[in-house]
Amino acid sequence: SGGQSAAQAPGSDASGDYGLYMLCPDGSEELLADVSELRVGMVANVLNEYKGVLPEDGQVFYSCIPVTSYRDVAVKSGKYTGWHENFEDAFNSLLLPGVHMVSAPNVLNDHLMDEPLFFQADHHWTPLAAYYLIERMMQTQGVPVVPYDEYDYLVSGFYNIQGLGDPMDLMYPLLPAHGNVMRSGTEGEDAPIIVYNNESYTAYLAGGNHVWTKYTTGFDTGRKALVIGDSFTTAFIPYLMPYYDEVHRADPRYYNSALNGGTVSEPLAQYGIDDVYIILSYDNGIDSDMSSKTLEYLLYG
């Protein structure tokens, strides 16, 4: 499969299998990672369930991020001009109003070949890539976007044991902000937003290895968000802060309802969450139970 013309709009449905396709110079495509159509339907159903527990104007966003090895195939092989997921429209056709699947590969494609969107030193995306995804999500809601360069940065270095590495942008929040680990609605120890002397990806949210964390942003927007996801959320959350009074984070890999006063639906109501963002790596993506059964279990137990 994968004979679709690269001229077709990114996000439109290919005649072949659902998946991530590499774009070839001759206009053909090669399937790199397929996605189960059945799983797309399962995930869509769960996302619609999340919409059902939010306020009437609440929004749900879902996105899965390729890891660095996919970027390496697209960029370093010299064989391709980009990538795209061919099922974004089909996925969104299954979603209720206010629920959105935003294809990270499609958002990032215009920047993929010549901007640092993934670290070489490990498998994560960079803050710039996370920013581009938030930019698209805000545009979807008609919200003005804070430019990437409006933030001040400490430019650090991030190198692995093989000596591969990249500069690393460690942003300073626009307003004084702070985080706290939350346990059953009670504020616990501080949770750093950026650890400026940490030369690894865990500089963002100090790795974020907590069940539930609340970040108070200093902004007065009248809205609060919950970000559910794995380690790819830690570079994402700092750029979400200007749009919410509070940004909460729940990690489905560690979630424990006994520590958090119930399933996710209880703290959603307790904290007055308006919008939910589900950000997962491809490893925990559509074909993974994390994106369907685990997310549903988080909501209902």
Regions found by a protein language model. Name each.
Residues 1-301:
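Extracellular glycan-modifying ectodomains
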